[in-house]
């Protein structure tokens, strides 16, 4: 007989492995693995629905408000999606809003019978593998999966940013930021040599993406985890962490400056790190992002846009390329601009009420992963505020997976089928 634990863990691990390397599977094997991912989500939905029937529709008391808001969100999203005239935009809108919401109960069901420690260990291992490939891409100057991106000319040399199997260095950077948060949590709670090695390798992988937002989000999340686990928030602890990171940063900067004299790749990556603090006209990428934010705000204030929005999936890279949209460079602005203030507020009420319900349940039951889940949520909220990263399937799935770890029903009797 096969245990449900084995089935659920296998299906969830498949989802994680696929989403962390989807560009490899989709490029080499077509849409087969993506369709199977959709099937897994369907299996999870059926399983969750079956459990509701068995329990006669009873839900956790702490999550009742979230469930009501969830159903309301789905209804509002469907109304807006149906009203989109362009069929391609309508399909993308359904995918980004309705399907992404449908994943949540499916993830919750798959997590019910899983060993969380095993899931996290696999997640970290994936990060180590991706980091090794990322180092290869950066210093070899070639991508493992060929794409249209040719890199950046810096000091007369072509420099590339690692994306490995994620199709984008932005998505890769965000995935590596989440993996680095998990690695930091594991090292802080168990300072073994293996956990230290995993942390170092995964942070290096994050650096190879040259994505500044995920790096900043990781550092802030690490501080939150450190302070949360350490007990009461006090300035001395925060100062200690900042001081340690500053010293490490200075040592890396000195090493980088020394090595960059004859290496354009290292010089480029060092320049990217320095530009985190440069929001003047000297930094084209930062000022360009600010311009996108200001334009989004102006569009939001136009006529009735702030009430009804300009329509789901009206912004983003695919919208810009296919139906005259533009990029907001912010998931926060994206939702308010596309959905309007009312629907966007309802969505964020659902999101934060779900996180709050998860934290309450986790504290009550002594869930050991509260700090980790909180760190991941903060990491993605920061990144999604400065980049519309949650329109990526992999990022949204992983974010909700960590939130659902707080909400999941603890394993009792292991059913067999």
Where are these regions (language model features)?
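Transmembrane alpha-helices of multi-pass inner-membrane enzymes
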Residues: 11-16, 181, 372-384, 388-417
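A conserved mid-to-late transmembrane alpha helix and its immediate loop/hinge
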Residues: 159, 203, 312, 322-358
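Hydrophobic transmembrane alpha-helices and their immediate junctions
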Residues: 61, 192-194, 227-232, 338-381
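Alpha-helical transmembrane segments of multi-pass inner-membrane proteins
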Residues: 120-145, 167-228
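Long extracytoplasmic/lumenal interhelical loops at the membrane interface
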Residues: 144-151, 278-339
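N-terminal signal-anchor transmembrane segment
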Residues: 1-53, 75-82, 380
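Flexible juxtamembrane loops connecting transmembrane helices in multi-pass membrane enzymes
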Residues: 241, 254-291, 317-320
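Aromatic-anchored transmembrane helix interface
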Residues: 65-74, 86-111, 122, 127
